[in-house]
Amino acid sequence: MAVTGNLSPQWLEEQYRIWKATPEQLSDDWQAFFEGFDLAHQAPTVDRDLAAKASAVDSLIYRYRDLGHLVACTDPLSPCKQDHPLLNLAVFGLDEGDLERTFYPLRYPQQSATLREILDLLRETYCSTIGVEFMHIQDPDQRQWLKDRMETVRNRPQLNEPDRLDILRTLQKATLFEAFLHKKFLGQKRFSLEGGEAMIPLLECLVVHATSLGVTDVVMGMAHRGRLNVLANIFQKPLENIFAEFKDNLELAFVGDGDVKYHKGSSVDRKIDGNGSIHLSLAANPSHLEAVDPVVIGKCRARHIGYGPGGRKRVLPLLVHGDAAFAGQGVIAEVLNLSQVDGYQSGGTFHLVLNNQIGFTTEPAHARSTLYATDVAKMLMIPVFHVNGEDPEAVVHATQLALEYRQQFARDVVVEVICYRRYGHNEGDEPAFTQPLMYERIRQRPPLHEIYAERLIKDGVDPSQIKALEQETADTLELALEAEPVNQRDVGFQAKWAKVQREYTPDQPKTAVDAERLRTLTDKMTSPPATFHVHPKIAKLLERRREAVSEGSGIDWGNAEALAFATLLTEQVPVRLSGQDCRRGTFNHRHAALVDQENAQLYFPLAFLEKGQAPIQVYNSILSEVAVLGFEYGYSMETPEGLNIWEAQFGDFANGAQVIIDQFISGSGTKWDRSSGLVMFLPHGYEGQGPEHSSARIERYLSLCAEHNMQVAQPSSPAQLFHLLRRQVKVPWRRPLIIFTPKSLLRLPACTSTLDELADGRFANILQGPGDAAEIQRLLLCTGKVYYDLLAAKQDAKRD
């Protein structure tokens, strides 16, 4: 169609009318032109109702993923919920007439499906015996990862008959063990697992599956409920020894005060068919619920570091919580907060919440302000799996999925098993006094292994095979009752602790360091790279430190501490310092990390002393005492060769971690045969900052001292601190060391040391002041700041 010149609109309109009436009057080119014109302007016909329903289906799918857990059948004591107002079809503008209509939903496992098929998948995945909270997770990759693995199998495990029989066998072992103890040792406390027996196949599944995923170490912390069952069936503690403890005739492997049988720790190397072996460790713990949690995390962190790259996938922290404690104990939030903090990451902790729906006699409404006991964990944006404790297969599936998530994303994960407690808080308690209706329902529930056996029989498993498995377990228990206890190996001082001496001896090892060596190290740690922009005041501080060592006098507290660290690091002793603001130091005296004033990059002078030195770790901690001190205590249990220090911001605040001090630091040796070389720095002194910033309560720590369980010191000079820190790793034994550190003395000109005192001296329990001993008429015993106050008063009074 050749067009020359401009065409008037009027002419085009006339041609268009002709084409509409008699198109054959126009040329083929103009006919094609007007056909294209009309086609381009025809609005597509859209079924608005169908589009609205398609959008509604997408919203419905999202809502089930988000809220399906609210109607999941997870409580074995309550009828299953049938519906929820927010999941009703009418809310989305859908009705029964749409059930057979085919939809093409977005972000769904199948390209197309009827609404009925979509609902079936969603209800089976999110509303059966597993309820999942995961849509709060902000990372879309994590959400998609979970959806892909849940919806494709409808949240059901793919188990063959041998797998199911293995689950049954573990249930039988768990239930029959408790029944046997109840019968043979009537009235004795054991804090039965009955009602929550699903925990045993869960743990067995976790151990086996973890091994296949590359885990070599599982470090576990748990309270008393079900602990004996776990020791017997997961840690393979000899049944003979457990029964002997009930008979009170088991000889301890060490001399000490001991502890009740459901507080003791254990360890075992378990062989796993086809996957090698895995080391299991159960941390000893007191009755203080959840206090062991940060200890376990610290132990795992130390093992991660020890293994090097890839260590986080090899070591799995496993914490077993009760529902009331998980919601009620503040240490839970503190431990969760450590999860992704630099220097404290655990690689993801597996949290198992055994929810028996009661805390001693307290019901959930009085135990928490949230719908779920686990709601505090959502602060980490992690998935929470709620599982019916009477569906062991669902428990196994949730465990496998949760563990795979942890290995994939290095994040914490929570599995809550909702169950019940068949007896009272302990076996001598009558729960019907306070929960009569609940315990009437519980009395009607058969044991879980019987429920699951019936399920297998319905699916075609031979009943005689099930009976044979049960008889095998019963025979094993009877034989163990009559057998002699197995000799216990000395578990407290093995492996990395084998070279550590259990008994305390009054050693005074050589802690002095050659003066020339001290000068060399000082030059290195006070000379940052030329390209590093040091704050002018810090540059002057480094210069003063260098001059003090060079001139041989005026070595202050921060300088002596840094020299103690430096000498140990170059002697292959790793050093870790942790606490609030400890990199700089609360009182601006340390500066273990320098900050470039132009780009904010960090430089750690102690990390660049010489090639091949031991590593230095200095971390500002979260604002917590109990979790961080517990973490560092656990870390120290794995590193007897290192110097591990926790510093309180002020010594007054250490009582926020009193449970760690009382139950672990002061008592672990005599109770559990466990040692620690942890050092606590507690700033102490009346410097006019009020009653909460003045006293670390020396008297409290002294009252905890007995039978050489720990050391308490208040060094009065920088040289004394230098020797005390070095002595801590030079002695052949390990005991916690509490050091009351100064405040004003950090810059007091009189409180300095000479180079000779570092190069020739050693730690002394008693220091003699200046003056002629023959002229002394009055003797004053004092320490720390008091000495310098008295010295100044003496000088002012011009008294000798």
Q: Model-derived features: where do they sit?
A:
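Alpha-helix capping and helix-loop boundary segments enriched in small/acidic/polar residues
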Residues: V3-N6, R48, R190-E197, H279-E290, ...
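Subset of Sec-pathway N-terminal targeting signals
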Residues: M1-F37
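Active-site pocket-lining segments that scaffold enzyme catalytic pockets across diverse folds
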Residues: L176, F180-E240, E543-E547, I555-P574
